[in-house]
Amino acid sequence: MTGIVFGEQPRWHEDRLWFSDWGPPEVIAVDLEGKSEVILEAPSFPCCVDWLPDGRLLLVSAREGLLLRREPDGSLVTHGDLTGVSDPPPGNELVVDGRGNAYVNGPGFDMMAGAEFAPGGIALVTPEGSARQVADGIAFPNGMLVTPDNATLIVADSYGKCLTAFDIASDGSLANRRVWADLGDGVPDGICLDAENAVWYGDVPNERCVRVREGGDVLQTVELDRGCFACALGGPDRSTLFMMATEWSGPEKML
């Protein structure tokens, strides 16, 4: 698919690839035949989506600092308020576990405004809608995933050039922080998990998508002609790799 302004955060859901185009901004779904549909127009960018266990879509509207929920009638309602969690509120990436816990991360500074660097963190929004910070001190938190057993959360630290893992407690808290993979010169952005528990990560400055196992061993590399911001596995057997690739000109081009 071409003509995407700035594609981010792909997810395979109900036999289609869903992703956010931060340009308009909007959420789009496309099937394997290339037929696409604009699902909704987002209030602002960055915007990212995932689904609750009951199938309702969650959407982060970063500018407002809100986690929104799409109801069956198509309306968007507030699921959680992130404005009190950190400044700026998190809004870069979203992942939901099988219990309905939503994790939202973000850097500790406003990159789009050229603010001075500060490390970021991860917020938890419970199924009841309460929000709190559950991890901090991550240089630049980016892509996230939760393992199928709901036991581990893995986050890409772009500035730290590593994948960091946490154990997920029964109340959604994160503990036992550890480096899951040191990526050397790799700069991870969006990530996804495959059937062998290896992780694919998009790499913007190195223009590639890389598959690594725990510990950092590189298993496979797909070279591209532009920055790879995110990736997802989908298709009938969840083995087709989809990559969101964009010619990156800096954050000022997104304003």
Located regions from the model:
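Beta-propeller domains
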Residues: 15-40
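Short, solvent-exposed loop/turn segments at conserved positions within beta-propeller repeat blades
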Residues: 22-23, 62-63, 109-120, 158-161, ...
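A short loop-to-beta-strand structural motif that recurs across blades of beta-propeller domains
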Residues: 26-28, 66-68, 113, 120-123, ...
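Blade-level signature of beta-propeller repeat domains, shared across WD40, Kelch, NHL, RCC1
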Residues: 230-255
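Beta-rich, blade/repeat-based domains predominating
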Residues: 1-16, 42-61, 66, 84-109, ...
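Short loop/turn segments immediately following beta-strands, especially the blade-tip
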Residues: 166-173
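A short beta-strand motif characteristic of beta-propeller blades
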Residues: 1, 34-41, 76-84, 130-136, ...
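Structural recognition of the beta-propeller blade-terminating site
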Residues: 30-31, 70-72, 126, 167, ...
